[in-house]
């Protein structure tokens, strides 16, 4: 992190002595630039191309050096469109990596990969900037104590709890509710924990980014009247951006989060939607740089790139960064190299199931596939652990019996199995929950359920105390008291119909 009062713009430092080169070749978003002998820029240095195109339009393109080719040439990847660039144009070596604004000035604002505001709310204070390329904290700086991060979402808190300062992956195919779950987590965490969040929109739809921004303004996470009171900074590099921007936007968001952790000594939440797009952009850049592809066409440096990002997301003695990352799973194949590489870094996984989404059970979190390293008796306590294990056993037995039920029907099951199926169906429905951010679609008010309430509810179902209630009473409710109240309402309605 550096204090730089002479910064001319967020992404680039003003230099007294300019090191100038010229464009030698343009291949889409990749530029080859020739520099004078002995004046070669370093890897990761930011280069700036300024000038006018053939119709007189102003051009200002920032690139990042990726390769030193020899013969005084470097190969750089552009962070914005290269339309209008021509061979021979002048290129300025800034002498430093891309640097972005950090600190309180970033809250409530939307930035691009260069740290430039894109929300039409005026300039941002850029006196304090930080380079996006940094090494991970030293081992001695890390904090190792284990504690649960309560989200207020029943299925998450009970079966795959999140670690404070950990990394959590949201896995699922297209359209099963990853982004809605992320929005709910931002909403709950801002309200329940009062924490600062940084949202990195990596290669996702611009419409979704806009929807999220509007949602945050409505919920008060972004305070329009007093922008400094906002609880989140947004960084976007969306689908329409060149691969260079999509590859680096995650680092821009992480750099902003690191400042809150290291300097302000805060607990920070870093949301990345979607980490797969970070890998995808790296794959595109790798091909453009002429590297031989690896398995399934991915870049050979996949593990290195993922590691350099993930190792910086950690808890130190100053504060913590808890990261929640949406992971798009191509063709729902968890063995694909991109999600498989991501798995290695995660403390918890929340797997979203298309089957549950088809049944209308939201959030469509798969209770048997989702895992957490925190679900151990010494961390969560015996009561929580035992309840979670019994819920999983009941659901697993129901899954095993489904083929028999499909062929022979429920009547052929033993009394014990019929009871297990009935309780499993109640549990399945009780794992659903109305979300605050989905109120506009469902008309049901959102519910935040504390961990103690969640455990109590599932214990009552497992003990058989609620065997007499209809299973639809457990669908889309908050705590167990709401389920019993809903059952009474259903009973009254059925009597009135008769």
From Swiss-Prot:
Catalytic activity line of the entry: ATP + H2O + 4 H(+)(in) = ADP + phosphate + 5 H(+)(out)
SUPFAM superfamilies: C-terminal domain of alpha and beta subunits of F1 ATP synthase, N-terminal domain of alpha and beta subunits of F1 ATP synthase, P-loop containing nucleoside triphosphate hydrolases
Main location: plastid
PROSITE patterns (UniProt xref): ATPASE_ALPHA_BETA
Domain of life the protein comes from: Eukaryota
Signal peptide start and end residues: none
Gene Ontology terms describing biological process: proton motive force-driven mitochondrial ATP synthesis
Keyword terms, alphabetized: ATP synthesis, ATP-binding, CF(1), Chloroplast, Hydrogen ion transport, Ion transport, Membrane, Nucleotide-binding, Plastid, Thylakoid, Translocase, Transport
Topology in membrane: Peripheral membrane protein
Molecular function per GO: ATP binding; ATP hydrolysis activity; proton-transporting ATP synthase activity, rotational mechanism
GO cellular component: chloroplast thylakoid membrane; mitochondrion; proton-transporting ATP synthase complex
Pfam families hit by this protein: ATP-synt_ab, ATP-synt_ab_N, ATP-synt_VA_C
EC number: 7.1.2.2
Binding-site list for ATP: 172-179
Cellular compartment(s): Plastid, Chloroplast thylakoid membrane
Purpose: Produces ATP from ADP in the presence of a proton gradient across the membrane. The catalytic sites are hosted primarily by the beta subunits.
HAMAP family: ATP_synth_beta_bact
Sequence similarity: Belongs to the ATPase alpha/beta chains family.
Subunit: F-type ATPases have 2 components, CF(1) - the catalytic core - and CF(0) - the membrane proton channel. CF(1) has five subunits: alpha(3), beta(3), gamma(1), delta(1), epsilon(1). CF(0) has four main subunits: a(1), b(1), b'(1) and c(9-12).
Protein name listed in UniProt: ATP synthase subunit beta, chloroplastic
Origin species: Platanus occidentalis (Sycamore)
Source taxonomy: Eukaryota, Viridiplantae, Streptophyta, Embryophyta, Tracheophyta
């Amino acid at each position: 992190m550096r204090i730089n009062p002479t910064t001319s713009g967020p992404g680039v430092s003003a230099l007294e002595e300019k090191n100038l080169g010229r464009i030698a070749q343009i291949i889409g978003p990749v530029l080859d630039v020739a520099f004078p002998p002995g004046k070669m820029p370093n890897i990761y240095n930011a280069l700036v191309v300024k000038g006018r195109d053939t119709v007189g339009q102003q051009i200002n393109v920032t690139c990042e050096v990726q390769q030193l080719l020899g013969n005084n040439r470097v190969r750089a990847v552009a962070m914005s469109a290269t339309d209008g660039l021509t061979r021979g144009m002048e290129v300025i070596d800034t002498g430093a990596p891309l640097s972005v604004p950090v600190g309180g000035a970033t809250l409530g604002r939307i930035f691009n990969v260069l740290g430039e505001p894109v929300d039409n709310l005026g300039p941002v204070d850029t006196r304090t900037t930080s380079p996006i390329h940094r090494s991970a904290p030293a081992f001695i700086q890390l904090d190792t104590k284990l504690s649960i991060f309560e989200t207020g979402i029943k299925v998450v808190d009970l079966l795959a709890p999140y670690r404070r300062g950990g990394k959590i992956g949201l896995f699922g195919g297209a359209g099963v509710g990853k982004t809605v779950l992320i929005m709910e987590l931002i909403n709950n965490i801002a309200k329940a924990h009062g924490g600062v969040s940084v949202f990195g929109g990596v290669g996702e739809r611009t419409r979704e980014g806009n929807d999220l921004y509007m949602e945050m303004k409505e919920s008060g996470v972004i305070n329009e009247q007093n922008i400094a009171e906002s609880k989140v900074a947004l960084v976007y590099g969306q689908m329409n951006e060149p691969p260079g921007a999509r590859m680096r936007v995650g680092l821009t968001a992480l750099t902003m989060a690191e400042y809150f952790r290291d300097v302000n000594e805060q607990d920070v939440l870093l949301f990345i939607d979607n980490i797969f797009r970070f890998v995808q952009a790296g794959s595109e850049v790798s091909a453009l740089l002429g590297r031989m592809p690896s398995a399934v066409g991915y870049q050979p440096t996949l593990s290195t790139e993922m590691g350099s990002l993930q190792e910086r997301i950690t808890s130190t003695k100053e504060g913590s960064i808890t990261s929640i990352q949406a992971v798009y799973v191509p063709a729902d194949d968890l063995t694909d190299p991109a999600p498989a590489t991501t798995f290695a870094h995660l403390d918890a996984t929340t797997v979203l199931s298309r089957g549950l989404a088809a049944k209308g059970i939201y959030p469509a979190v798969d209770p048997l596939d989702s895992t957490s390293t925190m679900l151990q008796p010494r961390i969560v306590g015996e009561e929580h652990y035992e309840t979670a294990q019994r819920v999983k056993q009941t659901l697993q037995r129901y899954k095993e019996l489904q083929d028999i039920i499909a062929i022979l029907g429920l009547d052929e099951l033993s009394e014990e199995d019929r009871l297990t199926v009935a309780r499993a169906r109640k549990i399945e429905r009780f794992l659903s929950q109305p979300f605050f951010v989905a109120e506009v679609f469902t008309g049901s008010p959102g519910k935040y359920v504390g961990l103690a309430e969640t455990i109590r509810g599932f214990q009552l179902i497992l003990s058989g105390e609620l065997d007499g209630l209809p299973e639809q009473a457990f669908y889309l409710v908050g705590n167990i008291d709401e389920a019993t109240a809903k059952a009474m309402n259903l009973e009254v309605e059925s009597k009135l119909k008769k």
